[in-house]
């Protein structure tokens, strides 16, 4: 009986240490947090937050860039219990400032800080969750993960299903661009490359295999252990909401942006499949309301044929036959030769 008690006590102590070791070792409130900037993203926040809670995220630092959809009130239940730190971030081109302010003010609160957008989802490929994945990087200051860009799944309008189960078609290859998960107290600056994609740190900056990374464009591309699923467009109708919001860095969001990024080459991706049952349970228990994506009035009664050129039309404009999937050079030539660009 005594041996059983001692064994149970030891197991309990191991569990407690495992769960709270970051507080003991690092003296931090959180092990893993996310910083993101948002503007009128209310229909997407619930799934994004609950999914990342499932991945072991302890806290969210959310910078609100002049939302007009009552985002703060919508998130109040999670702000009140300190799951979310809400930061008002007015003005244009505020993305880097958001990240700089959060790192400056809250660097002593969290061991790891993922710097991503609301349309980006951290995905562990082999680990149980992202928290487990990061446990292997104790002596590292920054982990660079590659994007997998997802297309529109040939959807003109959004269904009622989750983003993570609806959009399963993506490009053939991981993008060479990386996003950073950093130890914020080791950040040197965000301005070295004029981009938020790669953050300069004091200490080791590595990819998933602990190979050195020194730039936002990392051509030693790998996504075997973890990656970022980037739902950059979603449906064609939802793209128009993105277009009206604008890009936080000031990048033009137009039809060129849509057609260039819309790659559905690989079908039926299953990277999110194992998380869906538990995610739906999290969604059901969440205090956040389900918000429908607003309809775009001028799209009513339209379909893809109102916006896409046919191959024959493109060939006529270019003066030469085109490939089934247009090459970037062909698209560029099309823009130069056609004043119409795309049907409206």
Please place each PLM-identified region on the residue numbering.
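Active-site beta-to-alpha loop of glycosyltransferases that engages the nucleotide-sugar donor
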Residues: 36-50, 66
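Short beta-strand-to-loop acidic/aromatic patch adjacent to the donor-nucleotide binding site
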Residues: 110-123
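Conserved donor nucleotide-binding strand/loop of the catalytic core
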Residues: 79-94, 176
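Cell-envelope/extracellular polymer assembly enzymes that use nucleotide-activated donors
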Residues: 31-33
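Short, acidic, metal-binding catalytic loop of nucleotide-sugar glycosyltransferases
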Residues: 50-58
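A conserved acidic beta->alpha catalytic loop
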Residues: 64-74, 91-92
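Catalytic-site signature of metal-activated, phosphate-bearing donor transferases
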Residues: 97-100, 124-334, 343
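Active-site nucleotide-sugar/metal-binding loop of Leloir-type enzymes
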Residues: 100-112
